[in-house]
A protein has these predicted regions:
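Extreme N-terminal, non-catalytic leader segments
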Residues: 1-22
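P-loop (Walker A) phosphate-binding loop of NTP-binding proteins
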Residues: 26-28
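ATP-binding Walker
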Residues: 31
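Walker A/P-loop
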Residues: 34
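Post-Walker A helix-loop "phosphate-sensing" segment adjacent to the P-loop in P-loop NTPases
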Residues: 42-52
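ATP-dependent small-molecule kinase phosphotransfer cores
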Residues: 53-112, 116-118
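Conserved phosphate-donor/acceptor-positioning beta-strand/loop module used by diverse small-molecule
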Residues: 111-117, 127-150
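Small-molecule kinase domains that catalyze NTP-dependent phosphoryl transfer to phosphate-bearing small molecules
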Residues: 149-200
Length: 200
């Protein structure tokens, strides 16, 4: 839309409605990503500006795990084919996705926060340039201790996860958040990132 200033020949380009911000949380297993996100979600519960969408996963919910929408592999494939997902990926033998409704939230200028795989970062940036990547991590010794305490993997699997943890995403808008102390400290740092202007 172009607006001519009264009494002058000047033409002012009206600024488009600002787009929202996509905040993608990544990091190694044992870093505490879900705990940090949940802490921020609770702190921002009264703020409609911030959206924390539930992920869609091809597994049943179990006590202690994140709340998510469950789909069978067949239903997941059908939804993917009709473009129902904003992002989707496969990890550890499961399919994951973020709902397509995220696009509407971003179009209305809201901040969307989600835990994703590093594999979809570039696709997310292409879809929505105003993307911030928050790498939640901890020192290797802390990660190893947390992974062993979970008891889900054997020693070889733990070593493999620690090796992958060394690789961090690059590109614009990447923030590293160290979660090696009290959870509330990491949550407060994360809230500061969410409330800060996006760096694109």
């Amino acid at each position: 839309m172009r607006i001519a200033a009264a009494g002058t020949d000047a033409v002012v380009e009206a600024s488009a409605k600002p787009k929202g911000r996509l905040v993608l949380v990544v990091g190694p297993s044992g870093a505490g990503k879900d705990s940090v996100i949940e802490g921020a979600r609770r702190a921002l519960a009264g703020h409609a500006q911030f959206v924390f969408p539930r992920r869609i996963i091809t597994r049943q919910s179990d006590p202690g795990s994140e709340e998510h929408f469950t789909l069978s592999e067949a239903d997941f494939a059908r939804q993917r084919e009709v473009g129902a997902f904003f992002l989707h990926w496969r990890a550890h033998g499961l399919h994951y996705a973020l709902p397509g409704a995220i696009a509407d939230a971003l179009a209305h200028g809201r901040t969307v926060v989600a835990n994703v795989s590093r594999a979809v970062i570039e696709e997310a940036r292409r879809k929505h340039p105003a993307t911030t990547v928050v790498v939640v991590t901890a020192p290797p010794a802390v990660l190893a201790e947390r992974l062993k305490a979970r008891g889900r993997e054997d020693a070889a699997a733990v070593e493999g996860r620690l090796a992958r943890a060394a690789a961090e995403p690059d590109g614009p808008g990447v923030v590293t958040l160290m979660n090696d102390g009290p959870l509330e400290v990491a949550v407060e740092r994360f809230l500061q990132v969410l409330k800060a202007p996006a760096q694109v």
